[in-house]
């Protein structure tokens, strides 16, 4: 697999896995409006995943977005560890969403300038959706943080719990570095300042605290995932595994 294919696959996997997680909220959100909002955000991410995975399949010269989504094993997925974390309670979902939304906005803003026209076009469409997603997640971060004692406590606990996965957002490997030097990709290390400016401001507005430095978790890009991804994929891929190639 060449570097551009691998890079595009990472972007698609992030969107696909997070979309699946948000879909698990359908019918279970705290209120109908939130249920619809999470479902719509999940559908936006699914659309982004289709665009990235379709392009990855085109670059690879085989398969399509369905092949990549439904026939790969856990170790073949290269998504960030953050997006595969369980929904938990509503505060957990909001913290996870806010962290990735802030990163997506920073990433797609830069990736629109990619020398690869397809990546630039996908990002130009995705940035509009990502900005809406960020408004939603930051809005709820502030509501929960400034709400009751219980909601504020749950929001702080969610931030503390998921903070260890945020360092991977800025972890650069040889693929990131090589493609960024060619003007195709974005070096994730250069996204930290924009992400921290947004996230620190959001946490401050929510009257919450930025967690202290801690032992961070990485490895998703290399296919080294937490125990949560495998069961999620088993459910997501079940039908194609049982009835390969079937259409409906």
From Swiss-Prot:
InterPro entries: Aromatic_CoA_ox/epox, Ferritin-like, Ferritin-like_SF, PaaA_PaaC, PaaC. One of its GO terms (biological process) is phenylacetate catabolic process. Induction: Activated by cAMP receptor protein (CRP), integration host factor (IHF) and by phenylacetyl-coenzyme A (PA-CoA) that prevents PaaX from binding its target sequences. Inhibited by PaaX. One of its GO terms (cellular component) is phenylacetyl-CoA 1,2-epoxidase complex. It comes from the Bacteria. Component of 1,2-phenylacetyl-CoA epoxidase multicomponent enzyme system which catalyzes the reduction of phenylacetyl-CoA (PA-CoA) to form 1,2-epoxyphenylacetyl-CoA. The subunit C may be essential for structural integrity of the alpha subunit. This is 1,2-phenylacetyl-CoA epoxidase, subunit C. It comes from Escherichia coli (strain K12).
